[in-house]
A protein has these predicted regions:
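PLD/PLD-like phosphodiesterase catalytic module centered on the HKD motif
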Residues: 2-192
Length: 192
């Protein structure tokens, strides 16, 4: 999910109209394409400032040992198969309509990939999805918020009711965060 400047502006307009906007995407630790996270991450603060609710999928399954490549890049697809949970299907629920598909709503899906999606007009399905998100998001995703200094915090709601707060992308090293920031300056967002 790379909203781009135009997409971020559109989401802001929805909020101005009073529409609740909630996005669930992969955290860096659950992402199978680390470079995409670099371009998504630069829009988080702006989206949060505009009242867009952001959630990042937690890496639910962990292997005990990761390869050097996985440690450096954050990749979650090792040579012998997937080792962590990640989000691939996309869905949106808006005004009684539901979109379900593989389309990422980013430049790569628009211009480079072959993607598919369905729009289903069903208030009942939209309500069910909304209720499921309300019930399960805290267990499967970090909730992103802005602290009093305007910096992102990640809230991890535990089964015992405790909330763990992170001030950096959970599950990342300083090197990975530096690389994410460096890559975000490359002029390749249109390919993400």
């Amino acid at each position: 999910f790379v909203p781009t400047q135009q997409g971020t502006y559109y989401l802001k307009l929805l909020r101005v109209e009073g529409i609740k906007v909630r996005a669930l995407t992969n955290s860096f630790a659950a992402n199978d394409v680390a470079i995409v996270h670099a371009f998504y991450s630069q829009y988080r603060v702006e989206m949060l400032k505009n009242g867009i609710e952001l959630y990042e999928f937690k890496p639910v399954l962990e292997r005990r040992r990761r390869t050097w490549y996985e440690i450096v890049t954050g990749s979650v697809i090792p040579a012998k198969g997937k080792n962590k949970s990640s989000l691939h299907a996309k869905f949106f629920d808006v005004d009684g309509k539901v979109f379900i598909g593989s389309f990422n709503f980013d430049p790569r899906s628009t211009y480079l990939n072959t993607e598919v999606g369905l729009v289903i007009e069903s208030s009942q399905l939209q309500t069910q999805i909304s209720v499921m998100l309300d019930q399960h998001l805290p267990q499967v995703a970090y909730q992103l918020k802005l602290n009093s200094q305007g910096q992102i915090t990640w809230l991890d709601y535990q089964a015992n009711g405790q909330v763990i707060e992170y001030d950096k992308d959970p599950g990342t090293s300083r090197f990975q965060r530096t690389m994410i920031k460096a890559v975000s300056y490359l002029p390749i967002e249109w390919m993400m």
